[in-house]
């Protein structure tokens, strides 16, 4: 009989791995990804200026384990912020500034192209015509659609190829600054 000894295996130990470098994009994307939706249901007027109260509803499902629990969104917003119509127009303009820039290869990436298509073709945006030709109630609806569409477009980057254009890297920061609650 031939007996061969097998070498004893070393006991495996737990190893904690922490990221040594994180993407500058991860913070704004994580923030935007937590937003379920926004609503603009109320306004206030101060010194003749209308402020739109943005109700921000966050996603609360933190577990990745499938359950039969309902992940329904609360009736109450997680926080509210106030913005003027010009703040919405500035958001649109700042996103446009980065999305319309010439890319290295001379063509627009898919990410920036989605924003440009929306900015050029959608009627639900903060434009001068909307401000002058509509009432506050209609503007609330249009601005709600605008904000929710921009959040969806900012997060659509997960589905696109890895782009290194300035719009791809900057637009999420612009969006985060607009929707972040000032403390």
Give short role names for the model-derived ranges.
Residues 1-183:
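Intrinsically disordered, low-complexity regulatory regions
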């Amino acid at each position: 009989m031939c007996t061969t000894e097998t070498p004893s295996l070393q006991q495996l130990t737990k190893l904690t791995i922490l990221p040594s470098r994180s993407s500058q994009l991860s913070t704004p994307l994580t923030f935007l990804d937590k937003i379920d939706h926004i609503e603009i249901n109320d306004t206030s007027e101060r010194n003749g200026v209308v402020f739109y109260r943005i109700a921000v509803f966050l996603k609360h499902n933190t577990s990745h384990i499938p359950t039969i629990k309902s992940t329904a969104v609360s009736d109450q917003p997680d926080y509210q912020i106030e913005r003027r119509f010009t703040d919405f127009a500035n958001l649109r303009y700042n996103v446009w500034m980065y999305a319309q820039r010439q890319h290295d290869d001379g063509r627009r990436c898919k990410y920036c192209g989605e924003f440009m298509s929306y900015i050029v073709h959608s009627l639900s945006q903060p434009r001068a015509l909307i401000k002058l030709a509509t009432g506050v109630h209609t503007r609330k609806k249009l601005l709600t659609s605008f904000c929710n569409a921009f959040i969806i477009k900012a997060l659509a980057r997960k589905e696109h190829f890895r782009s290194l254009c300035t719009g791809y890297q900057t637009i999420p920061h612009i969006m985060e600054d607009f929707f972040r609650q000032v403390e």
